[in-house]
UniProtKB/Swiss-Prot annotation:
Bilayer-crossing regions: none
Species: Mannheimia succiniciproducens (strain KCTC 0769BP / MBEL55E)
Encoding gene (name): argA
CDD domains named among the record's database cross-references: AAK_NAGS-ABP (cd04237), NAT_SF (cd04301)
InterPro entries documented for this protein: AceGlu_kinase-like_sf, Acyl_CoA_acyltransferase, Asp/Glu/Uridylate_kinase, GNAT_dom, NAGS_kin, NH2A_AcTrfase
Name under which the protein is recorded: Amino-acid acetyltransferase
PANTHER family per record: AMINO-ACID ACETYLTRANSFERASE (PTHR30602), AMINO-ACID ACETYLTRANSFERASE NAGS1, CHLOROPLASTIC-RELATED (PTHR30602:SF12)
Localization in the cell: Cytoplasm
Pathway(s) where this gene product acts: Amino-acid biosynthesis; L-arginine biosynthesis; N(2)-acetyl-L-ornithine from L-glutamate: step 1/4
Every N-acetyltransferase domain range: 289-429
Additional remarks: In bacteria which possess the bifunctional enzyme ornithine acetyltransferase/N-acetylglutamate synthase (ArgJ), ArgA fulfills an anaplerotic role.
Record family assignment: Belongs to the acetyltransferase family. ArgA subfamily.
Length: 439
């Protein structure tokens, strides 16, 4: 990196350094991540986060290491509903694998960065477990679930500048030890602590779309679709599926953002947290976004968003002057100061109709539900204005609108003013949706 690039990166990252300081992050490290050749760099980056004043809880899994140890000892695991049935022999090997990882992670975190203080890593009985019991006639034996989390104790250590380390085994009040899914621990700890972020790692740079391209942003409903795909493909235990399970649950419970990154690419953690767009997949409700009416200050961003679509002939060209005149008609989605989606609501009062026009979503966010969010916002605004029918003219997205309750219509069904200016050369399809609740 050249010196000018380094200076620019520092300047761009400063707001995020200030934003993250004092916040609580829960970091999931599964067995694949720990076994990767890049793990030492991930640990170093975690240490750097701690030095920047971020409160960290590391929750680690050991499935890969456990399976390897079981195979070496000719022990075969039985699964029921995707949960390992842990008998006493299996538990001894689980404890061996987990104990080794706990020591290794602590040792690596204890390696001091130059001119930095020694890290205090705390691993204790913060989790109390209880047996899962019997389900459909199957006894899970020493496979357990969370009974209680000592949240106040965890907070005490975080406030005293310690990193809290949690593994996938926990004691019970009766003195037994149970094997727990590490994603369940990460989920419940993040929720109970009201963490700012949940962070996980996988072999891919986030969740990939069908073309193999990383999806930068997902809403919970979109994430659930990808999770179902992994499950249907028999990949219930893959890193992506286990992260999505946790991320969807914590997101619904109020954790603002979850991030899935590649454990193979050096620096992913820092790039995700200290740049605007990151490198992996972020799951959020929409806390980083603002859905609002556009103002004249938004016109440059609107032009940047819609110009490529105008060039492709997907949208009708609009002059800057026209945008200025109609700016109050536009609803936009603003993500950290960047307009990533827009739609206009043009009224025709005489017929009590309105057009949803100039619908555009930034390419990086088209695999998410931003279109649905815009449609809901436009529908809500139209109803507030007393509009009875909403219509669209489109050359490319007929099916998308039909799936959302619009019906094909004719030119004669348009308001007179729109009908008189209909462009027969574009041959846009006309779709109309009644907005009355009873319809």
């Amino acid at each position: 990196m050249r010196s000018t690039e380094l200076v620019q990166w520092f300047r761009q990252s400063t707001p995020y350094v200030n934003m993250h300081r004092g916040k609580t992050f829960v970091i999931m490290l599964d067995g694949n991540t720990i076994a990767s050749s890049n793990f030492i760099n991930i640990i170093n980056d975690i240490s750097l986060l701690h030095s920047l004043g971020i409160k960290l809880i590391i929750v680690y899994g050991a499935r890969v290491q456990i399976n390897s140890l079981l195979a070496q000892n000719n022990v075969t695991s039985v699964y029921h509903k995707n949960i390992r049935v842990t008998d006493p022999r299996t538990l001894e090997l689980v404890k061996q694998a987990v104990g080794q990882l706990s020591y290794d992670i602590t040792a690596r975190l204890s390696v001091r960065l130059p001119h930095s203080p020694v890290l205090n890593v705390v691993s204790s009985n913060f989790i109390l477990a209880q047996p899962i019991g019997v389900d459909d006639g199957v006894d899970y034996m020493l496979s357990g679930k969370i009974r209680r989390i000592e949240i106040d104790n965890i907070k005490h250590h975080l406030d005293n500048n310690a990193i809290v380390l949690l593994g996938p085994i926990a004691p019970s009040v009766t003195g037994e030890t149970f094997n727990l899914p590490f994603e369940e621990i990460a989920t419940q700890v993040a929720i109970k602590l009201k963490a700012e972020k949940l962070i996980g790692f996988s072999s891919t740079q986030g969740i990939l779309d069908p073309q193999g391209i990383s999806i930068p942003d997902l809403l919970p409903q979109d994430a659930a679709k990808y999770l179902n795909q992994y499950i249907q493909q028999g990949e219930y235990h893959c890193s992506q599926a286990r992260f999505l399970q946790a991320a969807i649950e914590v997101c619904k419970a109020g954790v603002k953002r979850s991030h899935l990154l590649s454990y193979e690419e050096d620096g992913s953690l820092l790039q995700e947290l200290f740049t605007r767009d990151g490198v992996g997949t972020q799951l959020s409700v929409d806390n980083s976004e603002d859905i609002r009416i556009a103002t004249v200050q938004d016109i440059p961003g609107l032009i940047e968003l819609i110009h490529p679509l105008e060039q492709q002939g997907i949208l009708v060209k609009r002059s800057r002057e026209q945008l200025e005149m109609d700016i109050a008609n536009y609803t936009i989605i603003d993500r950290d100061g960047v307009i990533i989606a827009c739609a206009a609501l043009n009224q025709y009062p005489e017929e009590n109709m309105a057009e949803m026009a100039c619908v555009a979503v930034h390419p990086d966010y088209r695999s998410s539900s931003r279109g649905d969010i815009l449609l809901e916002a436009i529908q809500k605004r139209a109803r507030q204005l007393g509009i009875e029918k909403l219509f669209v003219l489109t050359t490319r997205t007929v099916h998308w609108f039909q799936e959302r309750g619009f019906r094909l219509a004719n030119v004669e069904d348009l308001p007179k003013e729109k009908r008189d200016h209909y462009n027969y050369q574009r041959r846009s399809k006309i779709l109309i949706q009644p907005l009355n609740e009873e319809e």
